[in-house]
Amino acid sequence: MAIVERILIRATANGPSVELDRAAVAPGAAIAGDRYANGSGTFYEAGKDGQDVTLVEAEALEATGLSAEDSGRNVVTRGIGLNDLVGKRFRIGAVELRGNRLCEPCATLRDRTGVFRELVGRGGLRADVLVAGEIAAGDEIEEL
């Protein structure tokens, strides 16, 4: 069974991560309180797809030794291959999303953590919210 292990946000690109038990998400809005919701994300571009939610596999973090907080991703998953969700619809709890593109590691992550090459092809997924709702730690993830 694929699940959400953790939900994290950052108010600013280099600020500390804050863990949430649950989070409201809506199309084009990102997670309330996250840097992409307030337009201050490193790669923020108004109206650009793939900025609502970022996901990363717990298994990839464990293999590289990178913490969920340092990854900068919003949702840590377990038991699902996120690369397989590019271009596909999936559900977390009652929220429907579409995998937009891979969330490859960037220079900001490399400079902050020293991790780069190890996450190429394993850096996670950028997703668009299609149906608003709430996601929570422990929610099941299901491909539609």
Located regions from the model:
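Well-ordered mid-protein domain cores that form the structural environment of catalytic cofactors
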Residues: 103-107
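Membrane-targeting and insertion segments and their boundary/processing signals
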Residues: 35-38, 108-112
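Short, basic/aromatic beta-hairpin or loop at an interaction surface
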Residues: 64-74, 109-124
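Acidic/glycine-rich phosphate/pyrophosphate-binding loops and surrounding catalytic core
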Residues: 97-98, 117-134, 140-144
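Electropositive, beta-rich accessory/interaction domains or terminal extensions
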Residues: 1-96, 101-102, 132-134, 144
